[in-house]
Design a protein with these regions (language model features):
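Ligand-binding/active-site lining segments
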Residues: 34
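C-terminal cap/loop subdomain of S1 sulfatases and analogous C-terminal strand-loop tails that border
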Residues: 8-31, 48-53, 57-63, 67, ...
Length: 206
């Protein structure tokens, strides 16, 4: 398995512009796709038709998978291929990739992804939430009064995040903020605090 856990971090270009992870926007630690979308290659080092393990995970040679996957999926996938049983009270955040690596679509997998930075990282306190083709970026402490608290992109039409759509699709933006908030509460997430120590939870502001 060959993959990265984050985007490039070379000192090239603006952190939130187009540089080390081009054509994607941003770099390691940022809220944009260049900070979180990475290549992922899976292959058997030596394909063997008689191998029981390889029969348990038949990787489709030369196929390309477009369904969502995350680095958290590696652990449950390895457990599944190895035939390990997970205790019922043991929480695993990822999903088994066996069906996706065999070239199929896993219809049971939710098409959502949450990345949460309640602490300062490259100057921002933010959460990104993806649901299908849509991606929301929510800022808890905007760096300037003019900076919006939420950005909305359609990654299918605009993977480079050049066309911000929160004003054009306010209903979708509200829906995304609500879905993101529900997911954060479900995970028991921590939140940033203001100078008075008050917790800053997301809210629908338009």
């Amino acid at each position: 398995l060959f993959l990265g856990d984050n985007g490039g971090d070379a000192p090239l270009g603006d952190e939130r512009g187009y540089g080390s992870s081009a054509p994607l926007r941003g770099k390691k630690g940022t809220e944009f796709e260049g900070g979180m979308r990475v290549p992922f290659i899976a292959a058997w080092a030596k394909p063997e038709k008689k191998s029981k393990v390889q029969k348990n995970l038949p990787i489709e040679v030369g196929s390309m998978q477009t369904q969502l996957g995350t680095i958290m999926d590696i652990y449950p996938t390895v457990l599944s291929v190895a035939g390990c049983e997970v205790p019922q009270n043991y929480v695993i955040d990822g999903f088994d990739l066996k069906k996706q690596l065999s070239g199929k679509v896993d219809k049971k997998r939710p098409e959502s992804f949450l990345m949460h930075f309640p602490h300062a990282h490259r100057g921002s306190y933010f959460t990104t939430y993806r649901m299908g083709d849509w991606k929301l970026i929510y800022y808890y402490l905007p760096e300037t009064p003019k900076q919006p608290k939420a950005l909305l992109y359609n990654l299918k039409d605009d993977p480079e995040e050049r066309n911000e759509l929160s004003s054009a699709h306010p209903d979708k933006c509200r829906e995304m903020i609500q879905e993101m908030s529900a997911q954060l509460e479900k995970e028991g997430a921590l939140y940033p605090v203001d100078k008075q120590g008050n917790e800053l939870k997301p809210f629908v502001y338009f």
